[in-house]
């Protein structure tokens, strides 16, 4: 089907009305020289399909972070990992923030998971505040998914709040998925 008007993803940088585009992970300073050189150096590898298990990357992350390879999951973008989380762990009822990245609800529902929402308030500039903790404590589900910073609000959850959320999720044996891509 053809559309008379485009339905683009991301900002319209070509209109010159946008200085910085936060709708996609685009470096506003351009591609670093080291990345350009890495692309040039690997052109001959383009005939090979990438390693689906990302063995070299997993090894490098494991060594750099000092964690076992079995604790590392790599994928082709955040959406693949979000869907993998939902399929692999199979939560029955998950809590997401509202507003938030729409892919969480899509992935959860695709895995036959019931989705509940905790609404962030305009009056508090969409910050996650203390009223969330008692709500989470009494939530009758088995998973919590959110991004930090929040998409689309850009609000960052404090370290203290993250630690309290983690404590509640551990005590309640809830899956916790924190997306920090941006």
Specify the residue positions occupied by each region the protein language model found:
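Conserved PLP-anchoring active-site segment centered on the Schiff-base-forming lysine
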Residues: 88-109, 134
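Short, structured coil segments at secondary-structure junctions
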Residues: 68, 111-112
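Short loop-beta-helix segment that forms the pyridoxal 5′-phosphate
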Residues: 50, 62-84
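Glycine/small-residue-rich loop that forms an oxyanion/phosphate-binding "nest" at active or ligand-binding sites
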Residues: 77-86, 90, 178, 182
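N-terminal "arm"/small-domain region of PLP-dependent enzymes with the aminotransferase-like
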Residues: 1-48, 140
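Short acidic capping loops at alpha-helix termini that bridge into adjacent secondary structure
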Residues: 68-72, 93, 173, 180
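Active-site phosphate-binding strand-loop segment of PLP-dependent enzymes
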Residues: 116, 122-182
């Amino acid at each position: 089907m053809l559309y008379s008007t485009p339905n683009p993803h991301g900002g319209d940088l070509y209109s010159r009305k946008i200085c910085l585009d936060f709708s996609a992970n685009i470096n506003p300073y351009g591609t670093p020289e080291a990345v350009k050189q890495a692309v040039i150096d690997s052109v001959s590898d383009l005939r090979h399909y990438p390693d689906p298990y990302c063995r070299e990357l997993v090894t490098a992350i494991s060594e750099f972070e000092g964690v076992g390879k079995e604790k590392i999951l790599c994928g082709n973008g955040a959406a693949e990992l979000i869907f993998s989380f939902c399929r692999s762990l199979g939560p029955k009822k998950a809590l997401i923030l509202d507003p938030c990245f729409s892919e969480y609800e899509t992935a959860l529902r695709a895995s036959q998971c019931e989705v509940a929402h905790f609404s962030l308030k305009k009056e508090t500039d969409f910050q996650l505040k203390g009223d969330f903790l008692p709500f989470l404590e009494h939530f009758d589900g088995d998973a919590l998914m959110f991004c930090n910073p929040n998409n689309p609000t850009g609000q960052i959850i404090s370290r203290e709040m993250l630690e309290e959320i983690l404590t509640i999720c551990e005590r309640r044996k809830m899956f916790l998925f924190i997306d920090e891509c941006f």
